[in-house]
């Protein structure tokens, strides 16, 4: 009798979990590398190599994201964004356009050196009405004060919000949301390196 009750409880738990997962939006993370996926020899060292960690590792580091959406990760490339190329840009645009009907939004993990160029290119070439959000970090994932995990979590918040749709490609970093045509990198060492003109999170979602 006890075994039957345990079995029934397990079945109900699985069923409830399945229903809960079905109600969550589906978000696809396209990973390209960058500092957000960087790895250093020490948690207190500023020396690191960009694009070392794969997307599964980044997702596992922020389990809270799974309460926001059904997360699917896809590793596009593993590079520092200084090595970003036309080939990768085209691959990102084609991937988003091809998968648009099968997801509720996209997040692209990216280095900050060429994030503005990638955002602008995708803004002109992506033909998808779902949210497309770029996110990066100024400190590698292995550093004690890494900013990537919170930035990644916030990018999922933005990508799952229906108000983000049909606004063009966005950049979400440091608690602000930026339009692709308004973003530029101005500082190379501070976490508040990404600057913008006029377009703020409060304006988008007020």
Q: What name fits each language-model region?
A:
Residues 1-21:
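Gram-negative bacterial Sec-dependent N-terminal signal peptides
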Residues 22-206:
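Active-site histidine-anchored catalytic micro-motif
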């Amino acid at each position: 009798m006890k075994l039957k009750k345990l079995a029934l409880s397990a079945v109900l738990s699985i069923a409830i979990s399945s229903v809960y997962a079905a109600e969550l939006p589906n978000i696809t993370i396209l990973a390209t590398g960058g500092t957000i996926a960087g790895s250093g020899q020490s948690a207190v060292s500023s020396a690191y190599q960009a694009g070392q960690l794969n997307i599964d590792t980044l997702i596992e580091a922020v389990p809270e994201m799974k309460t926001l959406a059904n997360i699917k990760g896809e590793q596009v490339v593993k590079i520092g964004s200084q090595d970003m190329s036309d080939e990768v840009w085209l691959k990102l645009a084609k991937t988003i356009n091809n998968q648009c009907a099968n997801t509720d939004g996209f997040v692209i993990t990216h280095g900050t050196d060429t994030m503005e160029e990638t955002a602008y290119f995708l803004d002109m070439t992506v033909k998808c009405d779902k949210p497309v959000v770029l996110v990066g970090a100024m400190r590698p994932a292995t550093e004690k004060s890494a900013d990537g995990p919170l930035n990644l979590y916030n990018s999922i918040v933005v990508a799952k919000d229906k108000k983000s749709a049909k606004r063009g490609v966005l950049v979400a970093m440091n608690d602000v949301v930026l339009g692709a045509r308004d973003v530029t990198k101005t500082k190379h060492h501070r976490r508040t390196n990404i600057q913008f003109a006029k377009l703020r999170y409060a304006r988008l979602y007020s």
